[in-house]
Amino acid sequence: MRWLAPRADASVVLTRRPSECLAAPADAQGAYLVELGRAAFRTPLLLGGQAARAGVQCETCHRGGRNNPDFDFPGISGAPGTADVTTSVLSSHRGDGIDNPKPIPNLSGPKSALKVSQDPASPALESFIHGIITQEFDGDEPAPAVLQGLAAYVRALSPGACPSRATEPVTAAAALADVRRTLQAAIAALDHNDGASAALMVEAARSQLGDIDERYAGPALAEQRAALERAGADLAAAESDARRVAPSARADITIWLADEPAWSRPVLAAEPASLYSPRQLSLASH
């Protein structure tokens, strides 16, 4: 329930999200880069400094690759849905001492409404994203393929690809599907002999499991939390091996994916008692 506008109903905002307007590329290399970028977009590990410690990710301001009218971060937002990208709260590079929050742009809206060119022939978007990571959020230098992937993901967001329903439920099943998708991106990065990107993907998957864990609060769900924590720990060796592009990394991830349905079944069965449930979230927020 962090960074929600005071009048936002957490039981609605945190149990539904904007549907993703993603036009997946038809070519294999393009699809690979989009998957890398999509996963990186959804992990705070991409960023640095205060943002990473607070759990901020690209998805925080751009839910579903859109915007976030309910975003309200102390010292960064003015009105809900705005952010000051030149604040020293999150950046040691771009702080200008001026309180000037601006509306968060909708990355899935018309390309003409965005200030940075998304022409694939131009490096402008990659340069802009690089500045966001390393300057605006004090992050480390991203792996080249991750930077390319983030740009590819943003370019693939299109109003023409928006589903008929503007929002979709936030569920444990969807969250676990994202974990699997992120690990498939890790395997693809290993196939590209890219240890840095593969390691980030495994780290991102572990972080996603932690996010799911947070929704299973309370003594009654201790068994489900333990299963999620074991699942995260089981990826630790794969993360280390991925960085070295060791053959064992691919094997570890493949085994993890094969084992996931068995341990996740009780987790999914307990979802109605978790904070994925609008009712449970409403009770917890009052």
Per-region residue spans from a language model:
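Periplasmic c-type cytochrome electron-transfer domains
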Residues: M1-H286
